């Protein structure tokens, strides 16, 4: 647990101003961490199951240990270290303690992505699930041709790991409402039927990573149906747990069109499952988009050590994902 961490986010103050926070990424910045129990005193902890090994309440950050000046009378009723930290925050950012009630902060591993391996063919970085797919998708749209016959968009959503809930998850009506605004500006005007037809006629790639084959844990994978690092972008016909539970299952006609498109564009791709059927599974946002009747296929970068503090991808797969997303935007 004791890894260098950085803090990113915003603090919204009562006066309407917003303070951006980014501490731990630049040279010279301090970093933060979470303390570990020393093995000599961990007899009780070692008996816990993996899910109970570290309680959520034990994930507080170490922020400092300074002793404040005796002149700080307004902080005299607070613990010594807390006084010093609050003074630094006030002097550096103009933030009061109460302002954290209207803050949105993320704690992530500190440090930039790095080349991995002697040949520098791999990338080690945090949050590549799903930054590797979000970035390549956005870049593909930015660099796409403006002469396509279809309207293209890149929708970046969050909260996927907890069920795609909330206003910024794909479970919200944001995409549907945005499309309704487009339909309302067409010459024929808005109608509920026109909107539903438009949604049903969409083609979508659900940009999400897949588990790369791990040679150190081969028993978790069916090698014949696994994705491999440097094998290209991964297509998952279906996701889900222990088969297709909770899955979105792409139709073969749509997949065939994509295969033809990528073959003509000389894009490397592979078909895969997440792992052995009876080992577990996983889901994406594809099923939430498929409810509109549109064509949806999961397509993303294979990742090793998914959900670890530092995840591994291959440079080749990042390139092929970008090429695949860019080619997809030309689909008629």
PLM regions with names:
Residues 1-332:
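N-terminal hydrophobic/helix-forming segments and targeting peptides
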């Amino acid at each position: 647990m004791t890894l260098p961490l950085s803090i990113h986010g915003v603090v919204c103050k009562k006066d309407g101003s917003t303070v951006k926070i980014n501490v731990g990424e630049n040279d010279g910045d301090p970093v933060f961490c979470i303390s570990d129990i020393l093995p000599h005193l961990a007899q009780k902890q070692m008996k816990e199951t993996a899910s109970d090994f570290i309680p959520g309440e034990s994930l507080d950050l170490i922020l400092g240990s300074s002793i404040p000046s005796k002149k700080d009378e307004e902080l005299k009723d607070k613990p010594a270290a807390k006084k010093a930290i609050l003074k630094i925050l006030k002097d550096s950012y103009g933030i009061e303690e109460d302002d954290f009630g209207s803050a949105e902060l993320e704690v992530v591993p500190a440090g930039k992505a790095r080349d991995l391996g002697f040949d520098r063919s791999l990338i080690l970085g945090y949050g590549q699930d799903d930054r590797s797919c979000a970035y390549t998708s956005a870049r593909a749209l930015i660099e796409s041709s403006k002469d396509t016959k279809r309207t293209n968009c890149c929708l970046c959503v969050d909260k996927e790991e907890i069920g795609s809930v909330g206003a910024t998850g794909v479970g919200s009506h944001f995409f549907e409402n945005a499309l309704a605004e487009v339909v309302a500006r067409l010459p024929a005007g808005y109608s509920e039927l026109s909107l539903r037809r438009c949604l049903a006629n969409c083609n979508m790639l659900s940009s999400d990573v897949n588990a790369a084959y791990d040679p150190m844990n081969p028993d978790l994978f069916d090698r014949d149906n696994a994705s491999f690092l440097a094998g290209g972008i991964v297509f998952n016909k279906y996701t889900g747990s222990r088969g297709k539970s909770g899955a979105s299952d792409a139709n073969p006609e749509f997949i065939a069109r994509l295969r033809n498109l990528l073959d003509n564009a000389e894009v490397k791709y592979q078909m895969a499952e997440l792992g052995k059927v009876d080992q577990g599974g996983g889901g994406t946002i594809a099923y939430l988009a498929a409810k509109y009747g549109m064509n949806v296929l999961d397509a993303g970068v294979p990742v090793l050590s998914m959900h670890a503090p530092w995840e591994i991808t291959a440079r080749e797969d990042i390139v092929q994902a970008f090429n695949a997303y860019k080619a997809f935007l030309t689909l008629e």
